[in-house]
Amino acid sequence: MDIVITGPESSGKSTLAAWLSQRLGLPLQQEEARSYLGGQSGYLPSDLIRIQERQSQREMALADAPGAILDTDILTLMIWWREKYGPLPILFNDAWHRRSPRVYLLCRPDIPWEPDPLRE
């Protein structure tokens, strides 16, 4: 079963995901949005769709593992899209219904904010 680390920006998700991966001996899927948008100064709706596609491909590559630690997943992209653009494209809903069984750990922003070019 996969464990998804989710929550608002600067709440320790990536740190917790890396720690759990090491502690439990499960593969870590890092946040796809961070990899994809790393050098960009902005993004478009098409970028979020591409991030979802890449994230889904990476999740499928882990399908044979007994479980994985995911530093965010489709849920984060769905919330992001709704906040920025409104109603979700059907492909996000389809991806939500196709996902594997998961446990969600929700982080809260009770640690100091760390500025980052990708944070809004």
Model-assigned labels for residue ranges:
Residues 2:
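Walker A (P-loop) ATP-phosphate-binding motif of ABC ATPase nucleotide-binding domains
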Residues 5:
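Hydrophobic anchor at the beta1->P-loop junction of P-loop NTPases
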Residues 9:
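The conserved Walker
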Residues 13:
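Conserved lysine of the Walker
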Residues 18-60:
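Conserved substrate/cofactor phosphate-moiety recognition/catalytic segment
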Residues 66-83:
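A basic- and aromatic-enriched beta-loop-alpha substructure that forms the phosphate/nucleotide-
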Residues 85-120:
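A glycine- and Lys/Arg-enriched "phosphate-lid" helix/loop adjacent to the NTP-binding pocket
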